[in-house]
């Protein structure tokens, strides 16, 4: 038997230190994964807000271009127009086809079976044909119309929404419209 032979291998302390380092690394990776997932959700909510703001501006422009509304009607209700003053939940655009007017939410538009506006979430196969409608109940819209002069109006659409973390976020779009097509 040899005496004084040196043992090789890991000691218990070395194994514990390696375990702690590995645990800290894995916790950091899990945190980064969670933050990445949260960013995807936040960017999806921002994309919806941006699209709903564009939709409102397009409704105003289309109403002007097709003479659905007169130039004087392209105003908030307080100024003799048809667009609701203040903030309103996102609702289906009613019979006139224009958002943020008095008749919003009075008719069900496919695929939204209620008065609330919705988006279709893809089904299990990733296609919209078997998707389910998801109401946009955490979004609100405000259309503010300001007359710059008799031939020019400023339209500001603000979409406000609540994130999954409970934070209020908003997206605003401003454009100018004249009575000329």
What are these model-derived regions, one by one?
Residues 47, 51-181:
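Low-complexity, Gly/Pro-rich coil/beta segments used as flexible assembly/activation regions
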Residues 2, 18-21, 159, 168:
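Exposed boundary/loop context
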Residues 1-10:
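N-terminal leader/signal peptides at the extreme start of proteins
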Residues 10-54, 67:
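Aliphatic-rich helix starts adjacent to a transmembrane/signal segment
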């Amino acid at each position: 038997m040899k005496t004084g032979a040196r043992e090789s291998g890991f000691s218990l302390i070395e194994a514990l230190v390696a375990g702690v380092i590995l645990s800290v690394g894995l916790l950091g990776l899990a945190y980064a994964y969670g933050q990445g997932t949260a960013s995807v959700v936040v960017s999806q909510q921002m994309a919806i807000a941006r699209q709903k703001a564009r939709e409102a501006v397009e409704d105003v422009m289309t109403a002007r271009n097709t003479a659905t509304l007169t130039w004087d009607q392209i105003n908030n209700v307080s100024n003799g127009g048809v667009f609701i003053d203040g903030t309103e939940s996102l609702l289906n655009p009613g019979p006139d086809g224009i958002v943020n007017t008095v008749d919003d939410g009075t008719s069900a538009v496919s695929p939204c079976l209620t008065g609330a506006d919705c988006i279709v979430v893809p089904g299990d196969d990733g296609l919209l044909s078997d998707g389910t409608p998801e109401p946009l109940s955490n979004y609100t819209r405000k259309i503010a119309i300001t007359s710059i002069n008799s031939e020019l109006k400023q339209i500001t659409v603000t979409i406000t929404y609540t994130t999954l973390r409970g934070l209020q976020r908003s997206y605003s779009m401003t454009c100018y419209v004249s009575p000329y097509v």
